[in-house]
Amino acid sequence: MTLSFTTHWRDELPDFYTSLLPTPLDNARLIWRNAPLAQQLGVPDALFAPENGAGVWGGEALLPGMSPLAQVYSGHQFGAWAGQLGDGRGILLGEQQLADGRRYDWHLKGAGLTPYSRMGDGRAVLRSTIRESLASEAMHALGIPTTRALAMVTSDTPIYRERVEPGAMLMRVAESHVRFGHFEHFYYRREPQKVQQLADYVIRHHWPQLQDEADKYLLWFRDVVTRTAQTIASWQTVGFAHGVMNTDNMSILGLTIDYGPYGFLDDFQPDFICNHSDYQGRYSFENQPAVGLWNLQRLAQSLSPFISAEALNAALDEYQHALLTAYGQRMRDKLGLFSQQKGDNDLLDGLFALMIREKSDYTRTFRLLSHSEQLSAASPLRDEFIDRAAFDSWFAGYRARLRDEQVDDAQRQQRMQGVNPALVLRNWLAQRAIEQAEAGDMGELERLHAALADPFTDREDDYVRRPPDWGKRLEVSCSS
């Protein structure tokens, strides 16, 4: 099968990029490929053959139709305007066109210096590359909108961070890499016509149904608000903390993008900060919904030359409803509730209060709850609590609520076990795979990827146990 690549970004947005080629690594070699995604995209097995070396995965070759470029954008970082940013180490190799009309960017991360590298070296290390590959595929398996990881190479190139680490590259695939920061860039350069040009591009390629609408820009922005709200609501329900929700890390399609110092909750700790560089806790777990709105407000400001302030504010006012609707539905699913009743929020808040007091594991709590039976006062979750009387009191109210549903246990458990994962990507699991990979053993990386692809199946191995003490003390930063 021949892969088809287009150059829409290059052809339609000439002021939004710089052309350049990737800079290969020393002795680069393929260490992982995403076989299911490769099959979905029609990527021939021959491209992964060892005799072809690192090839396109290591920036050593281009496929027909590829025309590499680095995109320029700006953004707000930790609440402050950061000015011009851009693809500092990533290169958009091409836009794959599928037969069904869908299009996917192939973006090579760690591909070397670009005009937007600023003080960086344009490289990515094996540690951060593995973390992104694991997180993007874990989130996909959980049903959360995300960029994808297609392939990964390591090398003998030394990269200097807190320590010397091997250089690596990741082929990231997404329907689009357009960020809020793309719009901010030209707004703050006082070039509103280019902001509108980008909006036209995004609508033309990703919202074609809106092209002929008189108020297409407003309808598009309203959908961006909704998508952003729904994605962040999904993060909150699985206990995912992004860590660096700068506006340049916000996808216009509502994808989860730029996996850096992320983390999944172990103990239920609403003020959890996964990024040890986030001294003020701006991007703590509980702050993510508010930050999402703040970022949308920055995007709205960039669109103000061609959408009225009144219309933008009305669209922003829809954010909270969209987020709470999505969050409420998913949390009812997690509790096994098929209908909505007035006291449901109190029921959930009661469980959360217990979990905070007892430092309960977020993922294990909901998974064990999904095995409860409404006719039994016993629950496999009970043994997780020290204060059994407090749990029994809450569980009695929960069972009473389940009886109102008039849904049998099998149907309810099926729904609950389809939204309450048994397995999430805990930092200690990623760290174990990283350490073994750095020692040359990719076995754990493959095993962990395979496990994360099936998160809703009960397991008996250590992938689903609470983290060891050392795993809870892991610190993750923006260093990558």
From Swiss-Prot:
Coiled coil, from the record: none
Keyword Magnesium annotated: yes
InterPro entries in the record: adnlytase_SelO, SelO
Keyword Transcription: no
Cofactor(s), by name: Mg(2+); Mn(2+)
Residues the entry annotates as binding Mg(2+): N249, D258
EC numbers: 2.7.7.-, 2.7.7.108
Reactions mediated catalytically: L-seryl-[protein] + ATP = 3-O-(5'-adenylyl)-L-seryl-[protein] + diphosphate; L-threonyl-[protein] + ATP = 3-O-(5'-adenylyl)-L-threonyl-[protein] + diphosphate; L-tyrosyl-[protein] + ATP = O-(5'-adenylyl)-L-tyrosyl-[protein] + diphosphate; L-histidyl-[protein] + UTP = N(tele)-(5'-uridylyl)-L-histidyl-[protein] + diphosphate
The protein's role, per its UniProt record: Nucleotidyltransferase involved in the post-translational modification of proteins. It can catalyze the addition of adenosine monophosphate (AMP) or uridine monophosphate (UMP) to a protein, resulting in modifications known as AMPylation and UMPylation.
Family according to the record: Belongs to the SELO family.
Protein name: Protein nucleotidyltransferase YdiU
Organism, scientific name: Klebsiella pneumoniae (strain 342)
